[in-house]
Amino acid sequence: MRIPPLEDGGPGLGLCSEADVVRLVETFYLRVRRDDLLGPFFEARVRDWAAHHSLLIAFWSSLLRGTRRFHGAPVSCHLGMPGLTEAMFLRWLALFRQTTAECGNEAMRREADDAALRMANHFWQRYQVKRICIGEPTPLPAG
């Protein structure tokens, strides 16, 4: 997958309020849930949206504000999901960037978009490797 890069650099942590993070998460996931491609995928997997939002708010608050409230392994818990596609990752990123572009905080937009790009690339690469490795491994030839 080739995701268009963003500009280098970033403003660092502590650049937004907790209310900004809450608004980002709630607005973004409302878009995700309404999206024709992503909505059905997420709706089939997320049972408790309030709990999921709380977790995501802690995650993004840790990244954007340095709160260190999030404790978890986001990539590992998503790797087992069947059916993810490159188009889904690209759509997720496009919706995220649309949301951050409307947040009114340029420093937050840059930091959040950079983090989302890194995560999307890392997650997609790990997901592909896991998909290739499912099943019996091919042994190396003897000798």
Kindly label every feature range from the protein language model.
Residues 1-143:
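Core of compact, soluble alpha-helical bundle domains
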